[in-house]
Amino acid sequence: KRQGMDGAWLYAKYLRPKKKSRLPLVLQFHGYPGAGRSWLEQCSFVGMGFALIAMDCPGQGGFGYDPGGYEGTTVAGHIVAGLDGEPEKMYYVRLYQNIRILCRIVRTLEEIDQTRVFVNGASQGGAQGIACAALNPGLISRAAILYPFLSDFRMVWELHADEIAYEGLRYYSRWFDPAGERTQEWFAKLGYIDTANFAHLVRCPVLFGTGLADEVCPPATQCAVYNQLTCAKKRYLFEGFGHQEIQEFDDLLLDFFCREEAQF
């Protein structure tokens, strides 16, 4: 455990093979509102010679601690946590600051090859992966991103996709802004955590995957992220797949992380 922002405590699993040479590292980010996968599941990368760090998002389903203290409601999830206060006090702003702290810790690990630090994440983990790469361009050298969450909130709203993972938007609007008088205000604040707004800052190559039948993170909102990437990138579209494990993407990311050159 390490201390994070505003009284938070960061918890992460750290696994590495027994090798004397410096190791490539995968930063693994989990989906919403879960936790890092089990030690057994995380061993797949270790068996291939990678070290792995999997951080639990504070205040979600794992051991990371979040002290709360957000202004306003937390009515239905973390998207709206802090939405009534200043943007820097929103839950996801704090989370991305905590990821910055994690990356500072990574830079101190002598056993890690600092030229081969990769990120991997799906859904909320994909959003964190984009933000991590964007905010730490000198550290992250490759990113594998599958159906990223928290992207293009306005489009989510217009598509009436504010259910399941995005349901906080619907409850917040109905209970605290039923006349729509503050809609522009809270969409502006959500812009601070919109994955699409981080994408143009990413400098490393990105492997990107989208399930075309995804009803949780609609493909159109994922396009908003991919289209803003100005780095080397490659997108795979999986017809018939929703918001679920996509084994073909798993195989693609292994090749992406293992090969010497990341160019597509």
What is the predicted function of each stretch?
Residues L212-C217, Q244:
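Acidic catalytic loop of the alpha/beta-hydrolase fold
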Residues K1-K20:
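N-terminal cap/lid segment of alpha/beta-hydrolase-fold proteins
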